[in-house]
C-alpha cells in the first residue's frame, strides 16, 4: 500500500527480492517498527533532512537464487525467491493532499479503479502530464513546502501471498522508481517512506508480513 505525492509523473515498478539470511532480529524479536511520519511537525517530503524512513541502503542490483544453475540463467523470473507485483493495482486519485481516501491502508479496499503497474497515472486518464527541466511547475515557490491546493496524490493497493518456504527469510520489497515521494504500509502498518523519482528504493518488510494474504 502506498500513497504518492508528486509534481511530475509517476513510474512505478515493484517486485519482491529475497536476500539470503534470517529475518532481522533484535534480542530475538523482529526489528523495530519505524514510527509513522504523523509525529513530525511537517510531512517528510517537506523536510530536507529526510530522504527516506526505514529505507535500505542503496546497492548494486542483485538477485538471490537457490541453485547455481538457476543463477546462470541470468533471469530473475527463474528464481523461486522472486515475485513480481507488476500488473493491476487498485487505485484512487486526488488532485491535492488531504482529499485522498483516509486510512485506506487499514483494510482491503473495494470499488476502486484499476491501474496497470508499471505506468504513469497521467497516461491512464488522471491529471495531466507536466514536464519542467529548469523551473518549478508551480507558484509560489516556498521551500521546503509544497503546494496544497494542487498537487496530485495517488493511493495504490494490492494483495499478495508469500510462499510458505520463504518463512524465516529476509524479504525485501523493491520499487524500481516512484515520483516523487511515497509512503508504504504493509497490512495496515507504516513500513517506510522514500523519495528520489528515478532511483530504486528497497525496504525489509519481513516484520510486517503474515501468513496468507498480505496487503500493500
Label every model-predicted segment.
Residues 135-145, 150:
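Short glycine/proline-rich turn/loop motifs
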Residues 1-27:
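Bacterial Sec-dependent N-terminal signal peptides
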Amino acid at each position: 500500500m502506498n500513497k504518492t505525492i508528486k509534481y511530475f509523473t509517476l513510474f512505478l515498478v515493484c517486485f519482491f527480492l529475497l536476500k539470503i539470511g534470517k529475518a532481522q532480529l533484535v534480542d530475538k524479536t523482529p526489528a523495530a517498527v519505524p514510527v509513522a511520519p504523523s509525529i513530525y511537525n511537517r510531512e517528510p517530503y517537506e523536510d530536507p533532512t529526510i530522504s527516506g524512513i526505514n529505507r535500505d541502503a542503496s546497492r548494486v542490483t542483485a538477485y538471490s537464487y537457490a541453485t547455481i544453475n538457476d543463477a546462470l540463467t541470468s533471469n530473475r523470473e527463474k528464481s523461486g525467491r522472486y515475485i513480481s507485483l507488476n500488473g493491476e493495482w487498485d487505485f484512487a486519485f486526488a488532485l491535492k493532499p488531504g482529499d485522498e481516501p483516509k486510512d485506506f491502508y487499514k483494510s482491503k479496499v473495494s470499488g476502486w479503479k484499476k491501474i496497470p503497474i508499471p505506468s504513469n497515472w497521467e497516461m491512464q486518464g488522471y491529471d495531466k502530464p507536466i514536464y519542467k527541466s529548469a523551473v518549478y511547475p508551480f507558484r509560489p515557490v516556498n521551500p521546503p513546502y509544497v503546494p496544497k491546493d494542487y498537487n496530485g496524490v495517488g493511493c495504490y493497493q494490492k494483495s499478495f501471498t508469500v510462499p510458505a518456504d520463504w518463512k524465516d527469510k529476509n524479504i525485501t520489497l523493491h520499487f524500481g522508481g516512484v515520483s516523487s515521494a511515497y509512503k508504504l504500509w504493509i497490512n495496515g502498518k507504516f513500513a517506510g517512506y522514500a523519495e528520489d523519482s528515478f532511483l530504486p528504493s528497497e525496504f525489509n518488510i519481513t516484520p510486517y508480513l503474515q501468513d496468507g494474504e498480505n496487503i500493500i
